[in-house]
Design a protein with these regions (language model features):
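Positively charged, amphipathic and often flexible ligand-engagement surfaces
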Residues: 13-24, 30-443
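Short, aromatic- and cysteine-enriched interfacial helices/patches
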Residues: 4-7, 22
Length: 443
């Protein structure tokens, strides 16, 4: 009996020694490699939300769960805004508060700080839709630069988002997209050449300040019929600014069936020119518009046959980037749980640090908190895409969020289920605490 107790004691001592050696050898970040990542922890997902905020979210997603109601709201809201009816307050307290950081940088700073408290970073986006005209394009450039300068003063804002349609005329991009001499970088119309040169100068100014301030610039993807000049411009900026570290990123939409080959070609160009390739990998945002236009104009749709092909190429694209992580810096922008888990597991399988500077996860503010905050807790570099701007100006962005949440299969239901689950958990915890206090006071 005594020898058995001695054996038990020895076993415990060995366990303690092993634990001490293990924790000294591995940092907290490394320990996460031995724990299975899960996106089901709602306590972690919504720790930054009050009960009142969760209840507001439950109401909003519950409303958007009815596709017909969301469709009516999308049509009516812009009209009501134009009539001058007092709808600003309602919008501010519902959909605006859910998906937008604030109307000003100062308001947005509070949201960014709150996210930072939970190790979540921010991709800052001035969410105002583009207004055409050279003067407006110059103003947009100046605004992007102001956002970069502000981001540089904050500890958790490593990126800003830029839409080329904010600094370039849509018609010009469309013309250049189909120009026969586009690949050589030459166009036949002197006036449009001069206009394009001004676009290049605006983008250079933005990237130059970003490089000085060490802030990443994520160039948004657009419709396929204006995307080619954007791709060319992004390569030009990367060639200049991505020599030593990644500053400029282009967005690749994998719902297009040609984008995997494009990614490989992009990588080949980066190798030849000696720069780090920066890419933001997304599924895509203009599917219905792309298919409708292709059908109307009688050309083959650039969109994948179905979602399974998109998912396959998205996951293949992420894997390709991770396999070439020394040469490609990647922002994985996805609300798909499987894709995020798969990417995280790939990093672990290859022994790549969760906070490697060439890998970053991101989700939209107001959506998929279960992914964002659980990734952050596990030590991954992850951010919220956080737009800001006056309510009237960000209405188009908000309407897209409403449309996406009502059309993406199961997205709204998933958000609603997670919020309800967390509210139930909090009620249960509160009841248990109350019961414990009653029993203690009675004793």
């Amino acid at each position: 009996m005594r020898s058995f107790q001695l054996l038990q004691l020895t076993y415990v001592v060995y366990l303690i020694i092993f634990y001490l050696v293990f924790t000294c050898r591995y940092s907290q970040l490394e320990l996460h490699r031995f724990m299975r990542l899960s996106f089901n922890n709602t306590e972690t997902a919504f720790a930054y939300k009050t009960n009142k905020e969760l209840q507001a979210g439950r109401f909003l997603f519950g409303t958007m769960n009815y596709a017909w109601f969301a469709a009516i709201g999308v049509r009516l809201t812009p009209f009501l805004m134009k009539t001058g009816l007092p709808v600003h307050g309602m919008i501010r307290q519902t959909i605006f508060k859910q998906f937008v950081g604030g109307e000003t940088l100062e308001q947005t700073a509070k949201v960014a700080k709150k996210l930072g408290d939970y190790n979540v970073q921010v991709i800052l986006d001035y969410g105002v839709e583009a207004k055409e005209g050279e003067e407006n394009f110059d103003k947009a450039r100046d605004q992007f630069i102001r956002v970069i300068e502000y981001a540089a003063t904050q500890p958790n804002i490593p990126y800003i988002s830029v839409k080329i349609t904010g600094i370039a005329r849509f018609g010009l991009l469309k013309t250049l997209n189909s120009a026969p001499r586009l690949r050589s970088g030459v166009h036949d119309h002197e006036e449009e050449d001069a206009e394009w040169e001004r676009v290049r100068e605006r983008m250079y100014d933005i990237c130059e300040v970003a490089a000085e301030k060490n802030i990443g610039v994520l160039i948004d993807a657009e419709e396929s019929w204006i995307q080619d000049p954007i791709d060319r411009l992004s390569i030009e900026m990367m060639t200049i600014f991505n020599k030593e570290k990644c500053i400029v990123y282009n967005t690749i939409q994998l719902y297009r069936h040609d984008r995997m080959n494009f990614l490989r070609m992009y990588h080949s160009i980066a190798r030849q020119r000696g720069f780090i390739l920066g890419v933001k990998i997304v599924r895509g945002a203009y599917m219905e518009k792309e298919r409708t236009r292709a059908e109307q104009k009688g050309y083959p749709s650039p969109i994948q046959q179905d979602k399974s092909f998109t998912d396959g190429d998205f996951n293949s694209g992420v894997e390709y980037c991770i396999n070439n992580i020394d040469e490609i810096a990647t922002v994985i922008a996805s609300h798909n749980e499987y894709s995020n888990l798969r990417a995280a597991e790939l990093l672990d399988a290859k022994g790549i640090s969760h906070d490697h500077p060439h890998i970053h996860f991101s989700q939209l503010y107001g959506m998929s908190d279960n992914i964002t905050f659980n990734l952050a807790k596990a030590g991954y570099s992850v951010s919220k895409y956080l737009p800001f701007g006056p309510i009237r100006d960000v209405i188009p962005y908000l309407m897209r969020r409403a449309q996406e949440n009502s059309s993406i299969n199961g997205q709204t239901s998933r958000e609603l289920l997670l919020i309800k689950s967390e509210l139930k958990r909090r009620i249960k915890v509160a009841k248990a605490a109350k019961s414990k206090n009653v029993s203690l006071s009675s004793s």
